Design a protein with these regions (language model features):
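N-terminal leader/linker segments that initiate helical-solenoid repeat arrays
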Residues: 2-101
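Structural signature of tandem alpha-helical TPR/SEL1-like repeats
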Residues: 64, 68, 98-105, 134, ...
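TPR alpha-solenoid repeat register
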Residues: 86, 119-120, 164, 199, ...
Length: 278
């Protein structure tokens, strides 16, 4: 299952970069059009666990769908700690097939039963994973607002959490009319913890999106120093490519290919290297 999830993540990297470069963050590139008011974080009532679960089950193996449905039936009759245990089983089932959207609603439900910081944080992280690179813009916006709500609840439970602040900052950049407020939160995290992996990675992605490639390169160098994975090398290579540093781009793309061991990504990288080597 872990290998399957890795391929799904790596396979989405190319598409994400294309989206990032095609849709600059409002307020970062076109600052004159930025509005100062941020959207309120209101969870959507129209998007819920029941319809997300039903939608996500489509295309899954019939036996797995039955397992999930059976647990859902038990959850409906349970309460307290018994309900928490069943919800965790349900979250694990969705995690096995890399489906963060239903996971997010499940963790939020766990937080409502037992309002713990860890449940709100997991809900926020899963919502964020679910809306990232999602083609359905209406659903993505709803999940984004849910992420903001979950991270805000997590921060209320633990005001010093850099993980919650990082998640909230990232969600605010992509889900409100005041992206600079989200960037400010991320910078607060980096000021407190200069090597913070997730904050640097998130700022690096937003630097790519706002076409600040020099800044993106520095962010991903910091990330790679701690966690040299295929995804980060791919983003680093993209930064180098866009400022004309072809040799460095080729080297980074090659490292991404080696670490990913994913045929579809390897083919794409081979084409990129051929173009850059001309």
């Amino acid at each position: 299952m872990a290998k399957t999830k890795q391929i799904i993540v790596i396979g989405s990297v190319v598409a994400l970069v294309a989206v990032l470069l095609a849709q600059p963050i409002k307020g970062l590139v076109n600052k004159e059009k930025q509005t100062a008011a941020a959207s309120e974080s209101k969870p959507s009532n129209e998007v819920n666990l029941e319809n997300i679960s039903s939608m996500t089950k489509q295309g899954l193996d019939a036996s797995l769908v039955k397992e999930i449905s059976d647990i859902e039936g038990q959850v409906a009759k349970a309460s307290g700690e018994d309900k928490i245990k069943l919800l965790q089983q349900l979250a694990n089932k969705w995690d096995d097939v890399a489906k963060p959207a239903p996971q997010a609603f499940i963790y939020e439900e766990m937080a409502k039963v037992s309002p713990k910081f860890e449940y709100w944080l997991k809900a926020g992280n899963a919502y964020r994973a679910a809306y990232t690179n999602l083609q359905d813009s209406t659903l993505a916006q709803a999940l984004n607002q849910n992420a903001i709500h979950a991270y805000e609840a997590a921060l209320k439970a633990n005001t010093s959490s850099l993980d919650a602040k990082t998640g909230l900052g990232a969600a605010m950049v992509s889900g409100t009319n005041n992206p600079m407020a989200g960037i400010a939160l991320l910078r607060e995290v980096v000021a407190a913890d200069p090597k913070n992996l997730e904050a640097n990675k998130t700022l690096g992605l937003f630097s790519l999106q706002s076409r600040q490639f020099d800044k993106a390169i520095e962010r991903f160098k910091t990330v790679i120093d701690q966690k040299p994975d295929a995804e980060s090398y791919f983003y680093l290579a993209t930064g180098y490519e866009n400022i004309g540093m072809k040799k460095e781009a080729v080297t980074a793309f090659q490292k991404s290919k080696e670490l990913a061991a994913d045929p579809s990504l390897s083919q794409f990288i081979d084409r990129k290297i051929a173009e850059l080597s001309k």
